[in-house]
């Protein structure tokens, strides 16, 4: 083995190699520098374009020319990656304040990567790039050798505004990433000025000025102020953006989409839901975007009755019409280390950078002024002694030392005198020199005054920030509008709300008819079959069936066959226990209270929603004692209503319905006491249940007789829940009861 070879453990070599690569990616590729807000490739593109003379007023040049210069001189990487970085800086929908002014196809909001090849597009720097470049040749930047040591490039650009916040950036390094959102130039400049005026400004005071991110789109930022504050306090978090829409001629028109969201992609997402019958209330989609309206997506509902606010809320939850953006304010600070910083730290550190840049610029200018004044002093000496100077120049072999010794000049002054042209020896030149000297002396005093006074330095910083904010600033584009979180609609919510009548036959066949004006008994039934029950409701309400074992089932009316046919057997849609039959059917609002009871005399109160079970096997709703049956469910209109229970033997008991417990399932509590021996022999049992308002009058039908019971007479049957009840004379076999209520005039008969 050669003596030149170095022996190194593999783990040590790989560890060092990976660490070096990681540091390179972090420091020299993925993360921006706080001073100018640029990654190295962006900085090199901007600098190379300025070196090519491609300023905002220059003629456009082929982008390939710029990319070639960047790769050949400063950035030895792939041309496609370099060009893509350049494209991003030119896209007004990607960058809040583009650095490159492009001509040709530079991509579209719908497809940012649809840009033409670099041999076709042309580019130059935008006016905004002056904020990064205008002070470059004024001693403000540190210079470093390029990759092959043949050229010098700036280590950072002397940004006049906090570009790190204005344009933001994203990048993935090794073990860390950055996601800095763009901000409004005027807001950030104003915040920086506030920090100069009052270095102890708090984060809350800054957030009164900087409202939040400002993306290059008119879509709304819907994140709450409290969450935005937390993001700027910790340097991490996320914001949500939501599309802007309005109603126009019954349709929804979307006029602004979240940042980097494609309108075509959104339409695809909505169309996919329509194909899958997830949006039955939407009839049509159109993209009417053009040059005048860059974003105009139209959603047409099926009818004017559709609640488009609810539909849009669903679309916000299920499509890119609402999008979340990660924020991670990770950047390379002035100390050369990557760190996540909060808003106060970013602006404070940038002001340190800016103050240093301005100080360097002023010192550079002061040095130039002092050099020129020094030369002007020498020239004045020459003009005052012009004849002697000419004689020395004509007669001396070495005129420079002679001039220096005769007039006490420095080498620089003597050199300047010797370089004077004869025409500059005119009398008027002396006046010009004295005028220039006077102006430069004023400038020198001014520069020295600023450099010596912190107050004057602060005033200069503020004045420059204000001037740049006025020249380059614009109004906020992304409004902040705090909104509630969007929720996707359930399948139940999506169903159209139309009146329907559900019809059940004796043999358990079911069908759905549109409308409520249906003659259910007069419909066509199978041979040997006939009408059993009908309920009216809306097509987006579930219809509930209760079987003879006390189980409940729910079906959406939209899944039922049309009433034009004879329907379908319920057993094809539900799995009933062996021997069970469907006894009751009902449709109510979700929170409607119902009385569920068995003829054994037990019952409880529940809501309609407690009955809903969308699985085929249903749910155990009411627990039945042996040989007991389910009573028809009774609607409870008001908590103050009374419950009237009537047994087969004619015993009556009335008590407040509120005495019964509210359960979601179970046996319930005893309504009326029925002796077990009589119940077993079938001699007695709960026969009828009525819920009636207080002060109701009853008309009881016994055979052909009608007996009226007024409120005061009903007091005789009022008692505690669970008692035996009262057997009133002549009322042993009650056929039916009519309720005459001061509040409700309709019949209280609950049977189907």
Swiss-Prot record:
Site (Transition state stabilizer): 119
Residues under site feature: Interaction with DNA: 39, 75, 77
Regulation: Inhibited by quinolones.
Reactions the enzyme catalyzes: ATP-dependent breakage, passage and rejoining of double-stranded DNA
SMART domains attached to this UniProt entry: TOP4c
GO BP field: chromosome segregation; DNA topological change; plasmid partitioning; sister chromatid cohesion
Protein's membrane topology: Peripheral membrane protein
Assigned EC number: 5.6.2.2
InterPro entries named in the record: GyrA/parC_rep (IPR006691), Gyrase/topoIV_suA_C (IPR035516), Topo_IIA-like_dom_sf (IPR013760), Topo_IIA_A/C_ab (IPR013758), Topo_IIA_A_a_sf (IPR013757), Topo_IIA_dom_A (IPR002205), TopoIV_A_Gneg (IPR005742), Type_II_DNA_Topoisomerases (IPR050220)
Region described as Sufficient for MukB binding: 497-752
PROSITE patterns, A to Z: TOPO_IIA (PS52040)
Active-site residues from the entry: 120 (o-(5'-phospho-dna)-tyrosine intermediate)
Enzyme class: isomerase
Disordered: annotated span: 472-492, 718-752
SUPFAM superfamilies assigned: GyrA/ParC C-terminal domain-like, Type II DNA topoisomerase
GO MF annotation list: ATP binding; DNA binding; DNA topoisomerase type II (double strand cut, ATP-hydrolyzing) activity
GO CC annotation: chromosome; cytoplasm; cytosol; DNA topoisomerase type II (double strand cut, ATP-hydrolyzing) complex; extrinsic component of plasma membrane
Result of altering residue 84 to P: Confers resistance to quinolones
Pfam families attached to this UniProt entry: DNA_gyraseA_C, DNA_topoisoIV
Family, per entry: Belongs to the type II topoisomerase GyrA/ParC subunit family. ParC type 1 subfamily.
HAMAP family xrefs: ParC_type1
Function: Topoisomerase IV is essential for chromosome segregation; it is the principal protein responsible for decatenating newly replicated chromosomes. It relaxes supercoiled DNA. MukB stimulates the relaxation activity of topoisomerase IV and also has a modest effect on decatenation.
This protein's name: DNA topoisomerase 4 subunit A
């Amino acid at each position: 083995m050669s003596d030149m070879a170095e022996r190194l453990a593999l783990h040590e070599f790989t560890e060092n190699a990976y660490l070096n690569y990681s540091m390179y990616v972090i420091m020299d590729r993925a993360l921006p520098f706080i001073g100018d807000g640029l990654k190295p490739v962006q900085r090199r593109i901007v600098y190379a374009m300025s070196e090519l003379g491609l300023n905002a007023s220059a003629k456009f040049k082929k982008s390939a020319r710029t990319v070639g210069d960047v790769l050949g001189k400063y950035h030895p990487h792939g041309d496609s990656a370099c060009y893509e970085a350049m494209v991003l800086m030119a896209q007004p929908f990607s960058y809040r304040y583009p650095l490159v002014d492009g001509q040709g196809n530079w991509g579209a909001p719908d497809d940012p990567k649809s840009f033409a090849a670099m041999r076709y597009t042309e580019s130059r720097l935008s006016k905004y790039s002056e904020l990064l470049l205008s002070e470059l040749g004024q001693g403000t930047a540190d210079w470093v050798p390029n990759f092959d040591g043949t050229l010098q490039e700036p280590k950072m650009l002397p940004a006049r505004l906090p570009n790190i916040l204005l344009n933001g950036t994203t990048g993935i390094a090794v073990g860390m990433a950055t996601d800095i959102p763009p901000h409004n130039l005027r807001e950030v400049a104003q915040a920086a000025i506030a920090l100069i005026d009052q270095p102890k400004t708090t984060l809350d005071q800054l957030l009164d000025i900087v409202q939040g991110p400002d993306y290059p789109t008119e879509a709304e930022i819907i994140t709450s102020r409290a969450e935005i504050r937390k993001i700027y306090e910790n340097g991490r978090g996320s914001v949500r953006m939501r599309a802007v829409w309005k109603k126009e001629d019954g349709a929804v028109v979307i006029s602004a989409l979240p940042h980097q969201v494609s309108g075509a992609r959104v339409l695809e997402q909505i169309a996919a839901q329509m194909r899958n019958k997830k949006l039955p209330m939407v009839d049509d989609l159109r993209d009417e975007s053009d040059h005048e309206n860059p974003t105009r997506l139209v959603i047409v509902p099926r009818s004017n009755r559709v609640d488009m606010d609810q539909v849009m809320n669903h679309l916000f939850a299920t499509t890119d019409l609402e999008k979340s953006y990660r924020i991670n304010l990770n950047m390379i600070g002035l100390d050369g280390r990557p760190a996540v910083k909060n808003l106060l730290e970013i602006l404070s550190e940038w002001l340190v950078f800016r103050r240093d840049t301005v100080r360097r610029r002023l010192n550079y200018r002061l040095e130039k002024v002092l050099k020129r004044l020094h030369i002007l002093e020498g020239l004045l000496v020459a003009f005052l002694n012009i004849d002697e100077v000419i004689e020395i120049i004509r007669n001396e072999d070495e005129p420079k030392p002679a001039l220096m010794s005769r007039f006490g000049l420095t080498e620089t002054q003597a050199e300047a005198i010797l370089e004077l042209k004869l025409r500059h020896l005119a009398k008027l030149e002396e006046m010009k020199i004295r005028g220039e000297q006077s102006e430069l002396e004023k400038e020198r005093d001014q520069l020295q005054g600023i450099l010596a006074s912190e107050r004057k330095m602060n005033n200069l910083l503020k004045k420059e920030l204000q001037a740049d904010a006025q020249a380059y600033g614009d109004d906020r584009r992304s409004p902040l509008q705090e909104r509630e979180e969007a929720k996707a609609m359930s399948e139940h919510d999506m169903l159209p709300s139309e009146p329907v009548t559900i019809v059940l036959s004796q043999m358990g066949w079911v069908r759905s008819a549109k409308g409520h004006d249906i003659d259910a008994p007069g419909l066509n039934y199978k041979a040997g079959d006939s009408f059993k029950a009908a309920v009216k409701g809306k097509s987006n309400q579930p219809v509930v069936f209760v079987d003879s074992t006390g189980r409940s089932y729910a079906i959406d009316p939209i899944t039922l066959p049309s009433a034009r046919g004879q329907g379908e057997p319920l057993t094809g849609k539900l799995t009933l226990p062996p021997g069970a039959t469907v006894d009751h059917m009902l449709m109510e609002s979700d929170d409607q209270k119902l009385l569920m009871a068995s003829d054994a005399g037990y019952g409880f109160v529940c809501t309609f929603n407690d009955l809903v079970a969308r699985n085929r096997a249903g749910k155990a709703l009411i627990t039945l004692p042996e040989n007991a049956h389910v009573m028809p469910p009774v609607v409870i209109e008001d908590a103050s209503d009374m419950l009237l229970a009537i047994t087969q033997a004619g015993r009556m008991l009335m008590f407040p319905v509120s005495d019964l417990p509210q359960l979601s399932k179970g046996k319930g509590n005893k309504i009326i006491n029925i002796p077990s021996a009589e119940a077993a022999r079938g001699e007695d049992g709960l026969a009828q249940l009525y819920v009636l308002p207080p002060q109701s009058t009853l008309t009881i039908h016994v055979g052909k007789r009608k007996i009226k019971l007024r409120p005061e007479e009903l007091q005789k049957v009022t008692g505690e829940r669970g008692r035996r009840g009262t057997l009133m004379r002549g009322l042993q076999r009650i056929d039916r009861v009519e309720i005459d209520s001061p509040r409700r005039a309709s019949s209280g008969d609950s049977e189907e």
